[in-house]
């Protein structure tokens, strides 16, 4: 608590560049000026770091980061609980994490993208939540966003068939209310 999301961004950039000897892949991508996305509470994804935005007890924060090393992209998104959070917030974060693992456990050659989405959707909705449909996982490799699009909802046996060597993200976004989101400026 107390640190600004911009200070976190700056520390992460320093670590990527000076310790990992890598390139922050999101900086400059789609004119994005920062190294990471910091999405707080009801912001589902793509939140921008701000000097005026300080972490406080009770917040849930998603940090999404990509970096490039030796021509390959790595992408990671993780939720953090700041201090004491409400039981509802804690449960939402826990069930989202568990839903991600439900999707990961389905991954194997011969499975389909629909199998992954169905595993996530079934778990999420079975716990009284909804899956955001406007955003999805994606392939990663030499570019930050590659095919395939990995939907976090779906019908078993549909979509692309998984093959050995495919690299993609599974990063479900889950809402406590309805699935719809609105884009903020």
Summary of predicted features, one role per range:
Residues 1-185:
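Active-site neighborhoods and metal-handling regions in enzymes and metal-associated proteins
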């Amino acid at each position: 608590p107390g640190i600004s999301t911009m200070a976190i961004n700056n520390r992460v950039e320093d670590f990527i560049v000076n310790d990992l000897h890598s390139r922050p892949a999101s900086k400059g991508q789609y004119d994005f000026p920062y190294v990471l996305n910091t999405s707080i509470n009801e912001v589902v994804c793509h939140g921008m770091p701000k000097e005026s935005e300080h972490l406080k007890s009770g917040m849930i924060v998603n940090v999404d980061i990509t970096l490039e090393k030796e021509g390959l992209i790595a992408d990671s998104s993780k939720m953090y609980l700041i201090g004491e959070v409400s039981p509802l917030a804690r449960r939402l974060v826990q069930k989202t994490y568990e839903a991600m693992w439900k999707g990961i456990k389905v991954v194997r050659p011969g499975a389909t993208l629909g199998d992954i989405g169905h595993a996530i959707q079934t778990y999420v909705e079975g716990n009284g939540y909804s899956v955001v449909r406007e955003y999805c996982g994606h392939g990663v490799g030499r570019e930050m966003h590659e095919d395939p699009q990995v939907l976090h909802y779906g019908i078993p046996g549909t979509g692309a068939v998984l093959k050995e060597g495919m690299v993609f993200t599974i990063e479900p976004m889950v809402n406590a209310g309805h699935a719809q989101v609105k884009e903020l400026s």
